[in-house]
Each structure stands twice: as structure tokens, then as C-alpha cells.
């Protein structure tokens, strides 16, 4: 097994075994959705979004493709496509980063501190610089239209009463039912297939310098 393949399985397993709700697409570890909650103490705090993640064959040497599925109002996120303009993913990516870094640090950081000088949404960038109050009102308007818990439930299904992780930083206490199946909307740590894969990966050394050098030089 190549080091990229091992790293994909290891990083996705870490995400699956975390508190985040993950939905593999066609049982593939290279394409999946992640439920993302807006960071606390920001205008995005009450929003719930679905992230679409694709991992390239040569991950982690090439960065993943990540976008928002339901709409969000932000200077660095395209309203129509959900594409994210984030240097740490697009241009300064390092193999040292992993999926947990992206979900718990990089994207929350972008929502907390937008970069108005490199916008994908010009309206949001202009409001952020010139009218902070209207900017925050617009964010909340988009949350009400596209990203409340109820809207998320209607669009994507899932257990609306389950205790979710706080993607914006502090993780909430794990739901007592987290080991049960999520009926196709996520993968729990109690899933037999996940447990088997976890055992298979227990001996993997993701810091195998020889494997990393071999792939990096290809």
C-alpha cells in the first residue's frame, strides 16, 4: 500500500472516530461530507453547514478540495459554488496538515477572520470593510435561509436532536448514543466496518519517512 493510500485511510479514520458527523459518499474514503457548525462568538455561531471534501490520489502532498454545500455569506466563499479561497489549503498546504486541522482550525479561522483583500464574494467583502452591522445582519439572514438546524435537517436528513461537535473550536460533550448507526447520515465509532478498519490501521506509521520520500519524489 502506498504512503498516500495509508495516509488517506489514517486521516479519514481520525475524522470518523472524532465527534464530527461524517457521511462517506459511495463508501469512498476520498469523497465525503462533514457536518460543520459555525464558530462560537462569531456571527456564524448558530449556522450549520455541510462541507464537501474530496481527497486527491496523492494526498497529503496535494491539498484536498473543500467547499460548502449549503449557502454561506462570507468574503472568501463563493455563494454559488461554495468554493473556499484559503491560502493554507490552496497555496501553502503542507503534508503535515490533516483533516482535523482543516475542520477544527483552518475553516473556523477563516470564518473568524475573513480576508477582504482577496474576495470571492465582493458584496460580503465590501460590507465587511464599510458596514460591519449590515455585514453581520446579512450573515444571519443567510443562516436563517440556508443554515439553521431545521434547514440542515430538511436538506440533508440526520438526527436533529443528536449532540454535534462544535467545529468552530470547543468540542461539546459526546452524545451518549454516538456508538449507534446514523442511518446513512454519518458513520459512528460503533460501526463494525469502522472498527475493523481501525484495527487494520493500528500498525500504520504515518511518519514513515521512506514511504513519504518515495511518493514525494514521484
From Swiss-Prot:
Residues 3-148 form the UBC core domain. Keywords: ATP-binding, Cytoplasm, Nucleotide-binding, Transferase, Ubl conjugation pathway. Its EC number is 2.3.2.23. It catalyses: S-ubiquitinyl-[E1 ubiquitin-activating enzyme]-L-cysteine + [E2 ubiquitin-conjugating enzyme]-L-cysteine = [E1 ubiquitin-activating enzyme]-L-cysteine + S-ubiquitinyl-[E2 ubiquitin-conjugating enzyme]-L-cysteine. GO terms for molecular function: ATP binding; ubiquitin conjugating enzyme activity; ubiquitin-protein transferase activity. Residues 160-183, 192-218 have a biased composition (Acidic residues). Pfam families: UQ_con. The keyword Zinc-finger does not apply. One of its GO terms (biological process) is mitochondrial outer membrane translocase complex assembly. Residues 154-218 are annotated as: Disordered. It is found in: Cytoplasm. PROSITE patterns: UBC_1 (PS00183), UBC_2 (PS50127). The active site is at residue 85. Present with 1590 molecules/cell in log phase SD medium. This is Ubiquitin-conjugating enzyme E2-24 kDa. It comes from Saccharomyces cerevisiae (strain ATCC 204508 / S288c). The lineage of its organism: Eukaryota, Fungi, Dikarya, Ascomycota, Saccharomycotina.
Amino acid at each position: 500500500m502506498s504512503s498516500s493510500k495509508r495516509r488517506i485511510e489514517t486521516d479519514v479514520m481520525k475524522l470518523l472516530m472524532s465527534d464530527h458527523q461524517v457521511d462517506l459518499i459511495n463508501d469512498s474514503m476520498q469523497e465525503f461530507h462533514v457536518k460543520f457548525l459555525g464558530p462560537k462568538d462569531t456571527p456564524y455561531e448558530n449556522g450549520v453547514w455541510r462541507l464537501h471534501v474530496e481527497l486527491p490520489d496523492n494526498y497529503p502532498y496535494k491539498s484536498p478540495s473543500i467547499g460548502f454545500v449549503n449557502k454561506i455569506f462570507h468574503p472568501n466563499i463563493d455563494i454559488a459554488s461554495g468554493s473556499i479561497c484559503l491560502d493554507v489549503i490552496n497555496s501553502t498546504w503542507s503534508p503535515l496538515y490533516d483533516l482535523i486541522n482543516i475542520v477544527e482550525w483552518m475553516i473556523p479561522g477563516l470564518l473568524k477572520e475573513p480576508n477582504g483583500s482577496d474576495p470571492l464574494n465582493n458584496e460580503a467583502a465590501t460590507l465587511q470593510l464599510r458596514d460591519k452591522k449590515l455585514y453581520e445582519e446579512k450573515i444571519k439572514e443567510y443562516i436563517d435561509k440556508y443554515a439553521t438546524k431545521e434547514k440542515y435537517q430538511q436538506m440533508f436528513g440526520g438526527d436533529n436532536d443528536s449532540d454535534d461537535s462544535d467545529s468552530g473550536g470547543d468540542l461539546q460533550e459526546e452524545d451518549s448514543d454516538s456508538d449507534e448507526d446514523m442511518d446513512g447520515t454519518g458513520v459512528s465509532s460503533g460501526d463494525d466496518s469502522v472498527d475493523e478498519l481501525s484495527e487494520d490501521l493500528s500498525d500504520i506509521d504515518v511518519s514513515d519517512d521512506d514511504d513519504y520520500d518515495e511518493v514525494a519524489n514521484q
